[in-house]
């Protein structure tokens, strides 16, 4: 409204690179001026971004600090600092000891892996009495998969105390599993989520803490950056 730009949002039914590529291909065909994407797999999107660039379309990403073939990537904050902070919060809540596991939406998601790398590094440096029980777990940004993977974790690691999520779907999925297994107070879900999604689980104690930024602000900034670049600034 401020600029007169016709900005709109589209999304796929499933969170996967192939769906994102198809959407970008469609936007290229429509000859839009700029495309802004939160990539599931930055490497997989490089060819289609190059195609967009070759067509004269500006390309931007959010949450993809290693993305190539784009005009700019826009980050909300320092991803390492964010990951370390989330570990600090979980560690304090667990009294600096116990077993935990980390989830990512996709193993190819840049920011999710940057957060988890920082979480694990912080734990190893600061909290030696905590233990990561398994490699990071992919839940495909799907709450049902997060729920099922959490049930598997709880069966495999009966001493598990914390589950750290990166995708917004992890906390509610993990918290539901914790609630159903009667483990509130013994196991907690932590990580990136929004109050509108996690409220009930924060209230009943299955989720212990969440961390977030304002997605609307990220969208606003991305649009304004695109607008300024289109004007030649």
Identify the role of each PLM range.
Residues 1-233:
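A residue-level marker of the well-folded mature domains of exported/periplasmic proteins
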